[in-house]
């Protein structure tokens, strides 16, 4: 039987755990401009986890790009999914760049998704939808961040639209939805006091969410150069956190600290158990 044609911009990943507990790629479908590196086992505290880095030879995403990313983490697997750098969003005559991401995390699996910051250029449009499906006993740690523009070029909130929507499901049932639409030039822009806006979504059904929430709030309070807040998802399915940062180093440090805090609570490694 012939496999379906791989569409432009398609990236499909399925990871499994082998008999030794190491995560391996079971299937991979990819087509320009989305490519991934070879699997890397580089987490000393969780040697079974694998890291995949998404690379874009095009240097960014264009106004007629339609990207689709599908990831499935099977029982016992642990995947770090990241990108090589920030996502540059170019302006053009098309309807705007679009990216749909669909993540499935089975019981006993973990997916950590931390792409680089989205940097929309002047007059560009970027639309993103993320669907997260987690079974009880699974874990999703997801991050997204958007910059005010190409700040080094003097571009600040000159883009047309940034539209990002998230739908989280647990055992097939929707537990949370979020959508942020930023249109520079509107009155609502007065609510944004920094040059970077970021979101952390943790879906961990069956975990101690109250302990996780306390730890993440403490980490956020201890951080410098950022401000934000965190709350629990319905049905104690996880935690939602949003923050604003003025500087890129502060944003990066906040992401590093928040992920480390979540891992200590939910994924104790050999140095943390």
Curated annotation (Swiss-Prot):
Cystine connections: none
Cellular compartment(s): Cytoplasm
MF annotations from Gene Ontology: nickel cation binding
Coiled coil: none
InterPro entries, per database record: UreD
Alphabetical UniProt keywords: Chaperone, Cytoplasm, Nickel insertion
Top-rank lineage group of the source organism: Bacteria
GO cellular component: cytoplasm
Family: Belongs to the UreD family.
Function as written in the Swiss-Prot or TrEMBL entry: Required for maturation of urease via the functional incorporation of the urease nickel metallocenter.
Subunit-structure text: UreD, UreF and UreG form a complex that acts as a GTP-hydrolysis-dependent molecular chaperone, activating the urease apoprotein by helping to assemble the nickel containing metallocenter of UreC. The UreE protein probably delivers the nickel.
PANTHER family linked: UREASE ACCESSORY PROTEIN D (PTHR33643:SF1)
Protein name as catalogued: Urease accessory protein UreD
Organism: Mycolicibacterium gilvum (strain PYR-GCK)
């Amino acid at each position: 039987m012939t496999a379906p044609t791989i569409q432009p911009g398609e990236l499909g990943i399925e990871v499994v755990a082998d008999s030794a507990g190491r995560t391996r790629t079971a299937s991979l479908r990819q087509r320009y401009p989305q490519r991934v590196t070879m699997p890397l086992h580089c987490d000393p505290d969780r040697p079974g986890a694998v890291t995949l880095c998404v690379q874009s030879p095009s240097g960014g995403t264009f106004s007629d790009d339609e990207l689709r990313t599908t990831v499935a983490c099977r029982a016992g697997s642990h995947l770090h999914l990241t990108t090589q750098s920030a996502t540059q969003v170019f302006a053009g005559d098309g309807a705007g760049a679009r990216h749909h991401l669909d993540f499935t995390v089975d019981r006993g699996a973990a997916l950590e998704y931390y792409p680089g910051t989205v940097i929309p250029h002047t007059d560009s449009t970027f639309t993103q939808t993320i669907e997260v499906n987690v079974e009880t006993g699974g874990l999703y740690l997801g991050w997204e961040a958007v910059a005010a523009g190409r700040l080094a070029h003097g571009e600040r909130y000159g883009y047309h639209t940034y539209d990002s929507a998230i739908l989280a499901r647990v055992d097939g049932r929707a537990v949370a939805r979020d959508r942020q639409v930023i249109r520079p030039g509107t009155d609502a822009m007065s609510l944004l006091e920094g040059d970077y806006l970021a979101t952390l979504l943790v879906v961990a059904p069956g975990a101690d969410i109250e302990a996780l929430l306390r730890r993440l709030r403490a980490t956020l309070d201890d951080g410098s150069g950022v401000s934000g807040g965190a709350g629990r998802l319905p049905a104690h399915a996880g935690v939602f956190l949003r923050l604003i940062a003025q500087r890129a180093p502060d944003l990066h440090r906040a992401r590093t600290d928040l992920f480390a805090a979540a891992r200590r609570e939910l994924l104790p490694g050999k140095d943390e158990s």
